[in-house]
Amino acid sequence: MKIKAEIMDEKAIDRALIRIAHEIVERNKGIEDVVLVGIKTRGVPLAERIAKYISRIEGKKPPVGSLDITLYRDDLTTDLEQPLVKKKDIGVDVVGKIVVLVDDVIYTGRTIRAAMDAIIDLGRPKAIQLAELIDRGHRELPIKPDYVGKNVPTSKNEIVNVMLEEVDKVNRVVITEK
């Protein structure tokens, strides 16, 4: 795996997440009904970080849940993906809430579609919003994030790797080639 470019370092990731936290608070006029749901693996620590930044702004931390979605594919060898929700209990109530799904990279949109289906299966939220650290384009479904840390145009033979301290022992985002 050859690194082509580092597109975010630790400070850039933090700045993006702080901005996303402010945007979530501003758009929703506070956090009264806001629930963050991280998509495993890296969406969960991102959701926790955003919740921490929101608590610094609002003096109160929004609830954070997690959603486990697995893809029926090897991410590095094929573009055919069929998301599967592994666990339906996300740890937070979504009925009547503004659910902000948090993930590291949006690509085709299929993972987010599976996540939205899983959230709706748990009850009727007031709204579902989407926060992504990286939007790399190449959507196959009409899904657009509400909050984006960084737009990174890529080719289909490139991979965007988000590395986070909680999972990878380092904070950075790099582009590699397949």
From Swiss-Prot:
Would the keyword Transferase turn up in this protein's UniProt record? yes
* Molecular functions per Gene Ontology: RNA binding; uracil phosphoribosyltransferase activity
Motif (PRPP-binding) on chain: 99-111
Q: Could you list this entry's UniProt keywords, alphabetically sorted.
A: Glycosyltransferase, RNA-binding, Transcription, Transcription regulation, Transcription termination, Transferase
- The yes or no answer to whether the keyword Zinc is present is no
Q: Which reaction does it catalyse?
A: UMP + diphosphate = 5-phospho-alpha-D-ribose 1-diphosphate + uracil
Class of this enzyme: transferase
In terms of InterPro entries, this protein maps to: PRibTrfase_dom (IPR000836), PRTase-like (IPR029057), PyrR (IPR023050), PyrR_bifunctional (IPR050137)
Q: What is its EC number?
A: 2.4.2.9
> Which sequence ranges form a coiled-coil region, renumbered to this chain?
none
Q: Which GO terms describe its biological process?
A: DNA-templated transcription termination
Q: What does this protein do?
A: Regulates transcriptional attenuation of the pyrimidine nucleotide (pyr) operon by binding in a uridine-dependent manner to specific sites on pyr mRNA. This disrupts an antiterminator hairpin in the RNA and favors formation of a downstream transcription terminator, leading to a reduced expression of downstream genes.
Record's PANTHER family? BIFUNCTIONAL PROTEIN PYRR (PTHR11608:SF0)
Q: Which family would the database say this protein is a member of?
A: Belongs to the purine/pyrimidine phosphoribosyltransferase family. PyrR subfamily.
| Quaternary structure, from the entry | Homodimer and homohexamer; in equilibrium.
* Name of the protein described by the UniProt record: Bifunctional protein PyrR
User: In which organism is this protein found?
Assistant: Thermoanaerobacter pseudethanolicus (strain ATCC 33223 / 39E) (Clostridium thermohydrosulfuricum)
